[in-house]
Amino acid sequence: MGCCGLLLLALIPLFRLTIYAVPYYDDYNFGRFARAAIEQEQSKWAAISGALDCSRTQWYAWQGTYSSIFFMTLMPAVWGEQYYFLGPVFILLLLLAGSMVFTHVILRKVFRMEKWSSLAIQAVITIAEFMFIYSAQSGFYWYNGGIHYVGMHGFGLLFLSVAICLERAEGRTAKGLLFTASVLLAMITAGSNFVTALQGLLCLLTILLVSVVVERRRT
C-alpha cells in the first residue's frame, strides 16, 4: 500500500500542473479542422467530422497516422481555450491506465504473482514511467505531441493487455467482449506513431507464437 501512496503523491502535482497548459503550434494546425467544422455546422459534435476530414487529408498529404491525427484534431481548446487542460489530463490518465493494466496482466495473469506484491511492483513501474519521461512539457502538457506519443503508448499497452487476456479467456461472452475490444484498440494502435505501431505488431506476433506453442503442447 505504501507504493500506491507514493504513486498517488507523484500524480497529484502532475495533474495539478495541467491547468497551466496552453495550446501551442501544431495544436492550432490540426485543431483548425475541428474548429472550422464547428463554426460551419454550428454544432459542437461537428468536431468529429472535422477530425475525420483531417485524418483523411493527412493520409494522402502527409502520413498514415490516422488515429493520432484524429485525436490531435480533437484538441479540447477547439471548444474553448479554458478546456485545453482536459487534453493533458486525458494523456496522463491514458498512460496511468495503460501502465497499471499491462503490468497487472503480466504479473497477475501470466506470472500468477501474489496480489499485494504485484500491486507494489505495478506502482513502482508506473512511478518510474511518469518520473523519467524525457520531457514532461512535451509529453504531458503539449496535447499534440503528447497524444501522438505518450497517449498512443497508453493505447498500445491497453491493446497488448487485452490481447493477452483474449489468449487466456474462457467462455464465449468473455472472448467476444475481449475480441471486440482488441479489434478497436488494434485499429487505434495501428494508426499511432510508427514506433508504437511497430512495437505493437512485434508483441502481437510474439503472443500469437506463444499461444500456438502452448496449444500444441496441450494436444
Region annotations inferred by a language model:
Residues 26, 117-167, 193:
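Membrane-interface micro-motifs in multi-pass membrane enzymes
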Residues 56-90:
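Short hydrophobic/aromatic helix or loop-helix immediately within or flanking a transmembrane segment
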Residues 75-79, 104-108, 131-141:
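Juxtamembrane "helix-exit" motif on the non-cytosolic side of transmembrane helices
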Residues 90-116, 158:
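Transmembrane-helix motifs of polytopic, lipid-linked glycan transferases
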